[in-house]
């Protein structure tokens, strides 16, 4: 479904790709006055203008690239068209966050706001649910704002809406699955801080606005957090201050902090990576996993033939060099076998890393943040 459809060269090129692959597609259009003008929305001049999506199953899952993509609008449009064809259809949504039956200011729900800071989503008490049941539940602004449209759609189609509130229409049992609230709170707090660091870097890259940063700062303040509450960030900053050069730190699953500093041979992320593998493998810190004579030819290749100005090895080059060393060195082989243990570890760099380093660490499952 191509939502908010307008014919442009890029859209037409995308449609041609879909045609070439035999993928059916449908157009949904902008509706003037959406979402306030309910009488127009739920009419042939509103949803009626959209293409009818042909389906052959009794249960259809609507998914999309991300928030604000038009999932709910697609469902409501389809309800309108199904009814016109004499088919009685219903709608429910599965959405994990915010969690409706925990506190509005629980770190998990604040983390959801942090995750959607670019959309400016705001968690709020569901006023419809409170009025209907006298029960306080948590929802968010977009669902609360669209509920009158959903209710009017059901009222017009079936004469009655089966839902009395946005919370009613959701399927979410996540809150009942929490058995260690302190662990959940800590994980949520770390997510809030990660979102802040990532947004700061995205701002430098031109991918985030000042308003997004301001909102994340406010959320951190409301949660009683600061950047030093991220242990690896604190340690990386201390090492940079001590050495006067970029530094990195990683918190292993058992809580051990391992650091890495910039040298003539390795960038801070590469040094930290090797040091972490040593710790996990129980190898002494003074053992060299990669001989300097292995690193030197790689540096010469980078500078003399590939046009690089920085001779230091990135993480991908470091892992390739470690793999070569592992052929004849049992300790290097042992260290290489520890890579899977880095998954879900928290890492921070005191500077923004090159994209290649970010990609490697992401593939390893490391939760990276950077200062900028």
Report the location of each language-model feature.
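Flexible phosphate-sensing "switch/lid" loops adjacent to ATP/NTP-binding sites
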Residues: 1-63, 78-230, 234-237, 245, ...
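The conserved Walker
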Residues: 66-67
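Hydrophobic positions on the alpha1 helix immediately C-terminal to the Walker A/P-loop
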Residues: 74
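Short clusters of small/polar residues that mark proteolytic maturation junctions
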Residues: 261-262
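A short, polar/charged loop-to-alpha-helix boundary motif
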Residues: 265-281
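Long C-terminal interaction/binding lobes of large macromolecular proteins
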Residues: 284
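Active-site pocket-lining segment
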Residues: 288-308, 317
């Amino acid at each position: 479904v191509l939502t908010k459809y307008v014919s442009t060269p890029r859209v037409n090129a995308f449609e041609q790709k879909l045609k070439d692959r035999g993928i059916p597609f449908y157009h949904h259009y902008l509706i003037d006055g959406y979402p306030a003008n309910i009488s127009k929305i739920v009419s042939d001049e509103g949803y009626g203008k959209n293409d009818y999506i042909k389906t052959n199953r009794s249960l259809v899952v609507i998914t999309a690239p991300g928030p604000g993509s038009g999932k709910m609008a697609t469902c409501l449009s389809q309800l309108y068209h199904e009814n016109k064809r004499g088919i009685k259809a219903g709608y429910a949504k599965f959405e994990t966050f915010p969690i409706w039956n925990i506190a509005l200011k629980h770190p998990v729900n604040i983390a959801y706001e942090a995750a959607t800071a670019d959309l400016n989503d705001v968690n709020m008490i569901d006023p419809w649910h409170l009025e209907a049941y006298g029960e306080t539940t948590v929802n968010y602004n977009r669902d609360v704002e669209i509920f009158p449209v959903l209710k009017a759609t059901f009222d017009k189609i079936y004469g009655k809406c089966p839902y009395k509130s946005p919370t009613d229409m959701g399927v979410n049992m996540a809150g009942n699955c929490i058995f260690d609230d302190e662990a959940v709170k800590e994980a949520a707090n770390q997510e809030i801080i990660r979102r802040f660091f990532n947004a700061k870097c995205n701002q430098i890259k031109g991918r985030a606005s000042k308003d997004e940063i301001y909102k994340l700062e406010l959320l951190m303040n409301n949660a009683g957090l600061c950047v030093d509450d991220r242990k690896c960030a604190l340690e990386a900053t201390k090492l940079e201050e001590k050495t006067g050069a970029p530094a990195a730190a990683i918190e292993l699953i058992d809580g051990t902090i391992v650091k890495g500093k910039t040298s003539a041979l390795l960038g801070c992320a590469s040094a930290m990576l090797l040091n972490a593998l040593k710790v996990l493998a129980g190898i002494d810190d003074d053992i060299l996993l990669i001989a300097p004579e292995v690193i030197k030819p790689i540096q010469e290749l980078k500078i003399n033939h590939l046009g690089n100005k920085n001779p230091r090895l990135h993480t991908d080059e470091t892992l390739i060099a470690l793999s070569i060393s592992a052929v004849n060195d049992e300790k290097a082989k042992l260290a290489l076998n520890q890579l899977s243990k880095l998954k879900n570890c928290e890492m921070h760099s005191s500077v923004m890393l090159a994209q290649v380093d970010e990609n490697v660490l992401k593939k390893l499952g490391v939760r990276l943040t950077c200062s900028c």
